[in-house]
Amino acid sequence: MAEGEDVGWWRSWLQQSYQAVKEKSSEALEFMKRDLTEFTQVVQHDTACTIAATASVVKEKLATEGSSGATEKMKKGLSDFLGVISDTFAPSPDKTIDCDVITLMGTPSGTAEPYDGTKARLYSLQSDPATYCNEPDGPPELFDAWLSQFCLEEKKGEISELLVGSPSIRALYTKMVPAAVSHSEFWHRYFYKVHQLEQEQARRDALKQRAEQSISEEPGWEEEEEELMGISPISPKEAKVPVAKISTFPEGEPGPQSPCEENLVTSVEPPAEVTPSESSESISLVTQIANPATAPEARVLPKDLSQKLLEASLEEQGLAVDVGETGPSPPIHSKPLTPAGHTGGPEPRPPARVETLREEAPTDLRVFELNSDSGKSTPSNNGKKGSSTDISEDWEKDFDLDMTEEEVQMALSKVDASGELEDVEWEDWE
């Protein structure tokens, strides 16, 4: 009996153990199933969220790209429109062909054509909103007068062409009519602006034609100026050049400075009858540079001739004229002397009074001493101390006076017969 109880206890313990293991295993299995289910749900949820987030990001990116493309298109269209306006006012260099002078400009429709100022102004007028919104420029009377002669019905065909061919006019018309202006006001203002533009262009063409005509008819001013320069009179500076006289002083010596060294001139009339011969008996006069335009200076030649003839005649008679170095010399009255070789002849009459002629510049005083034996004249300097033998050779080279006794007597007789001139007449000579 005892063995049967032991077997029963072991059997019950095994059953209890098995039952306990079975329960624990089932609980563990349930936990595992529940964990797997939860893990699967979490994974599925996370995957779905990730997929949804990725899809939304992709959709947003695609939407952004699409909107940016539309923006780019709008920006491109606006830039093209503004480029047309800028090219209308100032064509860019890249639209200019380096072939002759052909400039291309952009039109509102997007094409290019040779540049024309009138068309450029017309395109600018068409794309300007002020053309249609503001009142026309100028006096209202002119606009009313033009409006009375304008018929909008006649412009229907042109209006249709403008709306079809000009995007700028079409856009402005759609935006402004009838919100801002009426249909008639829109087109009245536009066509009046075009009318003013045509008038302005007509004035430009008229001015251009007149300028070209004046240039074609303009005489050759340069040729006329050259002709006038060729026949122009002598300038005042050239006309007032004083008579240049050869100085009797050697080079390096200053000229006379005191008033006593002025020229002594006898008041006689110009000996028009006394003409020097063309042979060896000729008189070499002082070279003078005279201007033919000055009449008073042209008389210097006969005055010098008469002076030299009288001085020669005085020296032939042995006259010695003394001139002091200080103070003006008084009029000299000399006594006639009988020349050598003519002691028995009649005594000649006393010569005329010698007077002082004031000139602008002091000149040298020289008296010719006529040697009756040799027939040659030797100059003597009475305005300087000492004799003039040191410069007589130079004067003989410059002045060669050969006169016969008969010519000297004839000159003296004419001098005595002419009489004495007054001081006023000598001033007139100057």
From Swiss-Prot:
Residues 276-291, 371-390 have a biased composition (Polar residues). The modification Phosphothreonine is found at T356. Keywords: Phosphoprotein. Gene3D superfamilies: BSD domain (1.10.3970.10). Pfam families: BSD (PF03909). The modification Phosphoserine is found at S92, S166, S387, S388, S418. It comes from the Eukaryota. Residues 247-298, 319-398 are annotated as: Disordered. Residues 146-198 form the BSD domain. InterPro entries: BSD_dom, BSD_dom_sf, BSD_domain-containing. Residues 350-367 have a biased composition (Basic and acidic residues). One of its GO terms (cellular component) is cytoplasm. SMART domains: BSD (SM00751). This is BSD domain-containing protein 1. The lineage of its organism: Eukaryota, Metazoa, Chordata, Craniata, Vertebrata.
